[in-house]
Design a protein with these regions (language model features):
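Helix-start (N-cap) detector for alpha-helical repeat units in TPR-like alpha-solenoids
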Residues: 446-448, 481-482, 514-516, 549-550
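Primarily the internal scaffold of c-type cytochrome electron-transfer domains
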Residues: 15-16, 24, 31, 39-106, ...
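Structural marker of alpha-solenoid helical repeat scaffolds
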Residues: 442, 476, 509-511, 544
Length: 567
């Protein structure tokens, strides 16, 4: 039997019980603040953050385009109060459509849309890019010859574009019992904490953000939440509020039992996630979500230390008009550099950012430009310093920020290197194996560690060791889909097709959009002579991924006589 390999890409599904959503409607989460903070509410409601997501029909960007590589024509349109994305390939008389539910992205730089299939949430394969005024394929799929229709909507993306993000149903990554998020855009509470009871308790609440750094100061003694003022928090907790979404790093490792969307203002971000960078990994173009990293490399930040943060230059409640930007940001520069400096330093040029923070092509977001927060002197005569915090043997992986270096555990480094091994970084799998073995000795009941070590062992051809590790994972977490599918591959290779099918069926029932798993089931039943069952699995694959070539080909072969069990 020809297996459609599934080992190599690992995701860790939500296994905790989901919290029920309040409504199938996206609510306006900041309106409750408007009665007391009307001017701030008015200005903030016009910002990019406030409009980062919402219902698909709100501010709908319609249009169409032809993808030359796949030969597919896409169209986004509204009909009878419903928003649709249609697709068709005239050469095959192949066509279909998906109803769009939500948008992601304010439209300032771009926008994508989300749609649901049987409760699973996916991202459209096309994006709108405002700076070039055109539709294009989603990043990484520009050369795709098939429609990538089964792209799961990632929690991290939704977390940084919405508020009130709900946990997915246990055993899945992108299936929700109701609305995936309760509020469109970034609401007041995302930066200021829960506002429930704020009006009644504020007079009796203790001062928020005391210098003690104790998280308990964020909440009143009565149990009601008091509002967090980020500027008054200790520097690490202040910066964490922005860093949650404006820092990407090379690798991010969730802490045990924690997820980034659970983070609350005033808490330590390192309690939820640990970031790593490859030292010296400084591209000439700024990464779309790594403004914090770029700023840390600047002379301004290194000399100012904790006194300088995002709020030193940015007003989170308002955005200056286009004609006011130069003067606005110049005033921020002069807060430190002073008018006397300005009279001597190119007095004829009033836009500091044009030279020192220019817009450059973005590395991670196609067809867009981003502001270079490295605040460099052009032409640059000195190389920027490399980040050196805590290195690892064999490769320059370091913790970020520097204050978190002592908090990084063996588990953190192990999972970081395993992620790099997935990306086929040279030498990463060997370093990952070393760290993972050490981490498993320390925490032998951690299913994430065991699954990661299983992946590395399988990558190195150590199938017996990998099988033992996957079995341990599934005893601890029966909903671990990656361990189940990869163990299924090993069982099939050893001749235990019945055991493989049982493992694959469990995983495919939970995540039916994973085409490779469904195809393996179809092939297994085809080989066993159960072609009717095989057809059902192929049809299930095509429900989520209708342009999947191997699926369409196997579907055709299953209708031939004699039947061919090959994709």
């Amino acid at each position: 039997m020809l297996l459609i390999a599934v080992v190599g890409v690992r995701t860790f599904s939500q296994t905790s019980a989901p919290t029920a959503t309040k409504s199938a409607k996206v609510e306006a989460g900041s309106e409750a603040c408007s009665s007391c903070h009307s001017e701030i509410y008015k200005s903030y409601s016009k910002t990019v953050m406030a409009n980062a997501s919402g219902l698909a029909g709100d501010g709908l960007i319609t249009g169409e385009f032809n993808d030359k590589t796949s030969g597919v024509h896409y169209r986004v349109y509204k009909q009878d109060d419903h928003v649709w994305m249609s697709y068709d390939r005239e050469s095959e008389k192949f066509r279909g459509q998906r109803e769009l539910s939500y948008f992601i992205g304010s439209g300032r730089k771009g926008r994508s849309y989300l749609f649901s299939v049987q409760g699973f949430l996916f991202e459209t394969p096309i994006n709108w890019y405002s700076q070039e005024n055109r539709w294009e394929m989603t990043p990484a799929y520009a050369e795709a010859r098939e429609i990538p229709m089964n792209l799961p909507a990632f929690m991290d993306c939704m977390n940084c574009h919405s508020s009130g993000l709900q946990p997915p149903i246990a055993g899945t990554d992108n299936k929700f019992s109701g609305a995936p998020f309760l509020h469109g855009g970034i609401t007041c509470e995302r930066c200021h904490g829960a506002g429930e009871g704020h009006g009644a308790s504020s007079a009796n609440s203790p001062s928020v953000g005391s210098s003690s750094g104790n998280v308990s100061t964020v909440y009143s003694s009565s149990g009601n939440s008091s509002i967090v003022n980020p500027a008054k928090l200790p520097a690490d907790r202040r910066d964490a509020i922005c860093m949650e979404c404006h820092f990407e790093g090379t690798v991010a490792v969730d802490q045990p039992g924690k997820h980034l969307y659970q983070f609350q203002p005033g808490e330590r971000l390192s309690d939820y996630i640990h970031y790593f960078l490859l030292s010296g990994n400084q591209p000439e173009t700024p990464q779309a979500l790594s403004q914090v990293e770029a700023l840390s490399l600047s002379e301004c930040k290194r000399r100012s230390g904790d006194r300088m943060w995002c709020g030193s230059c940015h007003d989170p409640h308002a955005e200056p008009a286009a004609e006011e930007k130069a003067a606005y940001y110049r005033s921020k520069c002069l807060n430190c550099h002073g008018e006397a400096f300005a009279t001597k330093h190119h007095p004829d040029k009033t836009d500091c950012t044009k030279c020192h923070m220019p817009a450059l092509p973005s590395k991670d977001v196609a067809h867009t430009e981003g502001t270079d927060h490295r605040i460099r002197r052009y032409p640059n005569t000195r190389p920027l310093p490399q980040l050196q915090v805590r290195g690892t043997p064999g490769a320059p992986l370091v913790s970020f920020p520097k204050s978190d270096a002592s908090l990084a555990t063996t588990r953190d480094f192990a999972l970081a290197w395993e992620t790099l091994a997935q990306r086929n970084v040279e030498g990463a799998s060997q370093v990952a194996e070393e760290y993972l073995r050490e981490a498993v000795k320390e925490q032998g009941d951690d299913p994430v560690l065991l699954a990661s070590l299983g992946f590395v062992e399988q990558k190195h051809g150590h199938e017996k060791e990998a099988r033992d590790l996957y079995e341990r994972v599934l005893k601890l977490d029966p909903l671990a889909n990656d361990a189940a599918t990869d163990l299924g591959i090993l069982e099939a290779r050893s001749g235990n097709l019945r055991g493989a099918v049982e493992l694959w069926q469990g995983a495919f029932n939970r995540v039916p959009y994973r085409s490779a798993v469904g195809m393996n089931l179809a092939l297994a039943f085809c080989v066993a002579g159960q072609t009717d069952v095989a057809r059902k699995f192929v049809q299930r694959v095509l429900e989520f991924n209708p342009d999947y070539f191997k699926g369409k080909q196997l579907q055709a072969h299953l209708g031939e006589k004699p039947v061919q069990c090959t994709p």
